[in-house]
Design a protein with these regions (language model features):
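Active-site helical microenvironments for divalent-metal-assisted chemistry
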Residues: 1-79
Length: 79
């Protein structure tokens, strides 16, 4: 089962690769907020739900989309 730390590292690397100079402090704030909002949620396989938004943000970064899109990916299930 994938951990938060593993998925965060993959997302972080994708952002740095495709968006050098990105405001990682802003991304980290969004990750922290999403993590709090999904704190008690688990996926069907038992992994923490936060893995999903991190994976979506990684895909968005790899597609070369902008910062707002990455933040939206991280926060898309927080409402």
């Amino acid at each position: 089962m994938e951990t938060f730390e593993e998925r965060y590292a993959l997302m972080h690397a994708a952002v740095q690769k495709h968006m050098p100079g990105a405001d990682m402090a802003l991304i980290d704030r969004a990750v922290e907020y999403a993590d709090v909002k999904h704190q008690r949620q688990k996926r069907k396989d038992g992994s923490p739900y936060i893995i999903h938004p991190l994976a979506v943000a990684e895909i968005v970064a790899e597609l070369g989309l902008d910062m707002d899109s990455i933040l939206g990916a991280l926060l898309h299930d927080c409402i």
